Design a protein with these regions (language model features):
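Non-transmembrane, aqueous-exposed alpha-helical and coiled segments at domain scale
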Residues: 2-453
Length: 453
């Protein structure tokens, strides 16, 4: 591309250094001015930025007047996630559509409401004429999140009421995006797989009679075949990733951008940009890569001493990516347990058995047991560290033959539901733009004419 510089030149390096020298701040200033930088305070509470009825997270109880860690709890619209998932699993139903209804409308649907809602979503599950050919197939990229963002922003051009932020219109847009996100994600991967990796191209139309999870597997696989267990566990994964409070980075982004009065497509694209970040949406990829390295370095996967030595090497920055982290362990809110991981684990074991991956599952289980103790000893952390949902989700996606390029888009397919609910909530309750304050710590300077500098 003429005029578009693709290389970092020495000039760019030099200018970057000037930027760093004049932008770096003394870390002690954050403590001086009691600035939390959007993080947890000394009492473990987040910086309170708003109110929500959509979901809540509980990781502590008050016992004898003292706040103590407890088993993690997650509620969708006031319903415990354990009870929600057990409800549809016990009745051998897929839960994506039911929980989507709950998060958007604040109540559980009855049989007729759920049946009608499924028909509504299925009816929205189509893209504009030639969209796949003209938008997705042209200029495919190696990053599916960027392709997904581009597709969402392009859909703006096909919507004659794109800028209308009335509640019925925003709901229409959100339901349409929820319905087409699986298509956008899978088709983007198929384009990448064909045009960049040179593999065969498969474009399968979704089946309106099937659930979201079933359609993802149908569209992704050349033979369109899948087992009931595969579809069930993918559906469960999507439900567990749908929502996690208004304070997570991408959902807060949705609130902030929505408060400006912008259109739905721009708000969702902004949330996608947030989720793409490896500190938010890419953790499960790191877990899979870490275990791949572990399997190469550890000769006996059943030897706790050898596995423990590898985990200590991770913390000492001597193994894998040398970042000093055991990926999939620990969470910003949960300490004793992540309820999503607890729900997930039993089904992971069933899928591992079906796929002949019992030894792999045993290794994951061993790491889950050893890591908290080792982290506590090495880092002197005694508040509690446990496996989070990312610890098992990457393993599940790998067993489902989902390519790593689709790991974060799977997160987006689920979280678009939560983003939509929060966008509606912001529009219903707020009419002010979110504008947090920043403390200026730069001293005033005297202006000098150009010839005197």
């Amino acid at each position: 591309m003429a005029g578009f510089k693709l290389k970092v030149t020495p000039e760019m390096e030099s200018l970057t250094q000037v930027c760093v020298e004049n932008s770096k701040m003394d870390p002690s200033l954050y403590g001086k001015y009691d600035v939390k930088r959007g993080l947890r305070d000394v009492n473990g509470k987040g910086v309170l930025a708003g109110l929500t009825q959509i979901s809540s997270i509980c990781s502590t109880d008050v016992v004898d007047g003292k706040t103590v860690p407890c088993e993690g709890r997650l509620y969708y619209r006031g319903y415990d996630i354990h009870e929600l998932t057990q409800g549809f699993l016990r009745e051998q139903r897929f839960g994506f559509e039911e929980v989507t209804y709950l998060l958007l409308f604040g109540k559980l649907p009855n049989e007729k409401e759920l049946a009608d809602f499924k028909v509504l979503l299925a009816g929205q599950r189509s893209l504009p004429k030639n969209f796949v050919r003209d938008v997705i197939m042209k200029a495919p990229t190696k990053d599916m999140m960027n392709t997904l963002s581009r597709s969402v922003l392009t859909l703006y051009a096909y919507d004659h009421n794109a800028d209308d932020t009335s509640l019925p219109n925003v709901l229409r847009q959100c339901l349409n995006l929820i319905s087409v996100f699986p298509m956008l994600s899978v088709y983007s991967y198929q384009a990448y797989n064909h045009y960049i990796k040179g593999k065969s191209l498969y474009i399968h139309n979704p089946d309106p009679k099937l659930s979201v999870a079933e359609n993802i597997l149908l569209m992704l696989r050349p033979d369109m075949q899948y087992t009931q267990l595969e579809a069930t566990i993918l559906d469960l994964a999507l439900v567990l990733h749908m929502e996690h409070g208004g304070g997570n980075n991408s959902t807060f982004t949705t609130h902030v951008v929505t408060s400006s009065g912008t259109d739905t497509y721009s708000a969702v694209a902004a949330a996608l940009g947030s989720l793409k970040g490896p500190k938010h949406g890419g953790a499960n990829i790191k877990v899979v890569q870490m275990f791949k390295d572990m399997k190469k370095q550890v000769k006996d996967w059943t030897d706790e001493e050898e596995v423990g030595a590898y985990l200590r090497a991770l913390l000492h920055k001597e193994a894998f990516d040398k970042k000093g982290l055991i990926y999939g362990m620990g969470h910003a809110v949960y300490s004793i347990s992540d309820p999503r991981a607890e729900i997930f684990k039993g089904f992971v074991q069933k899928l591992a058995h079906e796929k002949g991956k019992d030894k792999d599952f045993a290794l994951y289980s061993m790491v889950e047991q050893l890591a908290p103790k080792i982290i506590g000893e090495e880092r002197h952390i005694y508040k509690g560290v446990s496996a989070n949902v990312d610890f098992y989700s990457g393993f599940v996606y790998s067993m489902l033959d989902l390519p790593t390029e689709l790991f974060t888009p799977m997160f987006a397919i689920a979280r678009i539901v939560g983003w939509s609910a929060h966008r509606m909530e912001e529009l219903i309750n707020m009419d002010k733009i979110i504008r947090p304050a920043y403390k200026t710590v730069k001293k005033e300077e005297i202006y000098r004419p150009l010839e005197e500098r």
